[in-house]
From Swiss-Prot:
Positions of the EF-hand domain: 426-461, 462-497, 498-533
GO molecular function: calcium ion binding
Species this chain originates from: Homo sapiens
Protein name stated in the entry: Calcyphosin-2
Source species, domain of life: Eukaryota
Residue sites binding Ca(2+) 3 per the record: 511, 513, 515, 517, 522
Entries under PANTHER family matching the protein: CALCYPHOSIN, CALCYPHOSIN-2
Biased composition (Polar residues): 134-146
Length: 538
C-alpha cells in the first residue's frame, strides 16, 4: 500500500539520520532550492518555502535547531536518542555557558578601561570635594555674614573642639557604613520609612507648639462682658414687670461699646512672627525631668522668651502647656550674670538659667534646686541667620573672658583624655558613684577638698594651677561649693548634643513608664554593639 502525505516528502528509514548532530553553523538558513535538489517530490505535492522560517530575537541561540542539522533517532538504538560517540547539543552548549560566567576566566581589563576607570574615580573625588567646599562656603557666608569678635577670638578653641569631635563622628560614620553592609535591604527600607515618619512627627509637633504660642499671646478681640449694660438693664427692669417666660436681657441684647474688657498688649501676628524657635532639655540628675520635651521661642521685638512643654498621653492625646511664661529674663550665673538674654546667647549647646522660685508652676522636683538650667539641643538656623542679619548686636569684653574659660577647660580635658582612653566608662561611672557618697546633704554640692580627693582616688591628677583656674570659673558665686555634675562636665567634657539626643531617645524607649530610671539589666538586653566597626575589628 502506498501512503501519500501531503506537504512532506516521505523518505526511507535508512536515509534518516540521528536527531542531535550539528554539521552546519547556526546561522545557516534553508532555501527551497536546496530542498528540491536533495528530495524530489511528486508534482501534486506543493513546495514548502522554508526560507520564511526565521528565529525571533527573544529566543536563545541554542534553542534553535535547523531541520537540516536535526537528525532523528537512529533505528538501530531503541534505548536512547543519542549514539555513544555523540554529545547532546544542549548539554554541550550549557557547559560552555557555565564556563563563560566563571569570574576567574574573565579576561583582564585593558589599559584603556583602566584609564577610564581612573579618570572617572578622579572626577568623582574632585566633584565631591568641590561640593563640600561650596557647602562650607555657603554655610560660612550665611552664618558669619559679619564675623563677630566672639568668632575671631575663640577660633582656636573652636578648631580644637572640632578636632576633638571629629573622631567621634568618624566612628559613627564607620558604624553606619558597617550597618548598611550588615543589614538586609528590607531592614534598610523599613528603617528609612520609620525615619521619615519620625521627621514628619517632629515637624508636626513643632507646628502644634508654634500655633499654641500664637493663640496664647495674640491680642484677642473683645467679645462680651457678663457685666456689660448693667445700668441699662436695671433701668429697663424698673419699668417692665418680671416674667418667667421672657428671656433675660443679657441674652437678648449684647453690645460691645460699653464693655469693661481691655486687652493687656498690642501684639499682632506680624510682630510675633519675628521669633527664634529652639529645642531644649533640662540639665538634671532626675531622669524624668531630663526627658521633658521643651520647645522655646525668643522674640526679637522685646527680647523676651517663653518655653513650652509638649506632653503626649498614649498614642493620640497630646497637650501643650507653658513651662516658662513669656517675659524678659536675665542670666543667673556665669560671666553674664544679671545681663539680659539677647540673640547671641542662643546657639546649640548654650545653657539658659532661671530662678526656680520665680516660676510657681514648675514641678516640685525642679523647685528643689535653686537654678533651673536648660540646654539648647537644636535651633532654627535659617531663622537665626535672618534675625542676625536684621539686628546689629555689639559684643562686649565678656566674650574674651568666656573664651579664656573654655581654653582652660580644654587644656584640662586634653590632659585627662589619655587617662580616660582605655578605661573611660569605668572611671565615669565610678566617679559618679563616689560623688554621690560624698554628697551627704543630697543637694549635689561639694567643696574643693572633696573634688581633690575624688581626683586622687581615680588617678586623675591635674596641676595645681589648672585646678585653681577651673575652680575659680566654676565657683562663680563664691560660696565655696560647686555642683559635682558641673565639675565633671567641665574637667572631663561631655557628649555633643547631636549624639545625646539619641541617648535620650533610647532612654525614653526603655523608660516606657516615665519613671525616670531604667534598670541596668534592661539596658544590657537592648544594647548591642556587635555591628560597630571597632567591635568587628576587635
Amino acid at each position: 500500500m502506498d501512503l501519500e502525505v501531503k506537504g512532506v516528502a516521505a523518505t526511507s528509514r535508512s536515509q534518516i539520520q540521528p536527531f542531535f548532530g550539528r554539521k552546519k553553523p547556526l546561522q545557516q538558513r534553508w532555501t527551497s532550492e536546496s530542498w528540491t535538489n536533495q528530495n524530489s517530490c511528486p508534482p501534486v505535492v506543493p513546495r514548502l518555502d522554508l526560507g520564511s522560517l526565521v528565529d525571533s530575537d527573544d529566543e536563545d541561540n541554542f534553542s534553535y535547531i535547523p531541520l537540516s542539522t536535526a537528525n532523528l533517532p537512529n533505528s538501530s538504538s531503541t534505548l536512547g536518542w543519542v549514539t555513544p560517540c555523540q554529545t547532546p547539543y544542549t548539554q554541550y552548549h550549557l557547559n560552555k555557558l557555565d564556563q563563560n560566567i566563571i569570574p576567574e576566566n574573565l579576561p583582564a581589563p585593558t589599559d584603556k578601561c583602566k584609564l577610564k576607570y581612573q579618570q572617572c574615580k578622579t572626577e568623582i573625588k574632585e566633584g565631591y570635594k568641590q561640593y563640600s567646599q561650596r557647602n562650607a562656603e555657603n554655610t560660612k557666608s550665611n552664618v558669619t555674614h559679619k564675623q563677630s569678635p566672639r568668632n575671631k577670638i575663640d577660633e582656636k578653641c573652636v578648631q580644637d573642639e572640632e578636632a576633638n569631635t571629629d573622631d567621634l563622628t568618624t566612628l559613627d560614620r564607620k558604624a553606619i557604613l558597617q550597618q548598611g553592609y550588615a543589614d538586609n535591604s528590607c531592614d534598610k527600607q523599613q528603617r528609612a520609612r520609620k525615619l521619615d515618619a519620625e521627621i514628619v512627627a517632629a515637624e508636626k509637633k513643632k507646628q502644634i507648639v508654634a500655633e499654641q504660642v500664637m493663640i496664647d499671646h495674640l491680642s484677642r478681640a473683645v467679645i462680651s462682658d457678663p457685666e456689660q449694660n448693667l445700668a441699662i438693664e436695671q433701668k429697663e427692669s424698673d419699668h417692665i414687670l418680671p416674667d418667667s417666660k421672657m428671656t433675660p436681657l443679657r441674652f437678648r441684647k449684647r453690645t460691645l461699646h460699653e464693655t469693661k474688657i481691655r486687652t493687656h498688649s498690642t501684639l499682632t501676628e506680624n510682630v510675633l512672627s519675628h521669633k527664634l524657635q529652639f529645642d531644649g532639655r533640662i540639665v538634671s540628675r532626675n531622669g524624668r525631668d531630663a526627658c521633658r520635651e521643651l520647645i522655646g521661642f525668643f522674640f526679637t521685638h522685646d527680647q523676651s522668651l517663653t518655653i513650652y512643654e509638649y506632653r503626649q498621653f498614649g498614642k493620640n492625646r497630646t497637650n501643650v502647656l507653658p513651662f516658662i511664661q513669656k517675659s524678659i529674663y536675665s542670666h543667673q550665673c556665669g560671666r553674664r550674670k544679671g545681663k539680659q538674654y539677647r540673640l547671641g546667647d542662643f546657639y546649640v549647646g548654650a545653657t539658659l538659667t532661671f530662678l526656680s522660685s520665680d516660676h510657681l508652676s514648675l514641678p516640685e522636683s525642679i523647685k528643689e534646686n535653686t537654678l533651673l538650667k536648660l540646654r539648647i539641643t537644636n535651633i532654627d538656623q535659617i531663622a537665626l541667620d535672618s534675625l542676625k542679619t536684621a539686628s546689629m548686636e555689639q559684643e562686649d569684653d565678656i566674650i574674651i573672658q568666656e573664651t579664656n574659660d573654655r581654653l582652660v577647660f580644654k587644656a584640662i580635658q586634653d590632659v585627662l583624655k589619655e587617662k580616660l582612653h582605655k578605661r573611660g566608662v569605668r572611671i565615669l561611672t565610678g566617679l559618679g558613684k563616689y560623688f554621690q557618697q560624698l554628697d551627704k546633704e543630697g543637694n549635689g554640692l561639694l567643696d574643693k577638698a572633696d573634688f581633690k580627693q575624688a581626683l586622687k582616688v581615680f588617678h586623675l591628677e591635674v596641676s595645681e594651677k589648672d585646678f585653681e583656674s577651673a575652680w575659680l570659673i566654676l565657683n562663680d558665686n563664691g560660696n565655696g561649693k560647686v555642683d559635682y555634675g558641673e565639675f565633671k562636665r567641665g574637667i572631663i567634657g561631655e557628649m555633643n548634643e547631636y549624639r545625646k539626643s539619641y541617648v535620650r531617645k533610647a532612654f525614653m524607649k526603655l523608660d516606657f513608664n516615665k519613671s525616670g530610671s531604667v534598670p541596668i539589666i534592661n539596658i544590657r538586653k537592648c544594647y548591642c554593639a556587635k555591628k560597630h566597626s571597632q567591635v568587628i575589628s576587635g
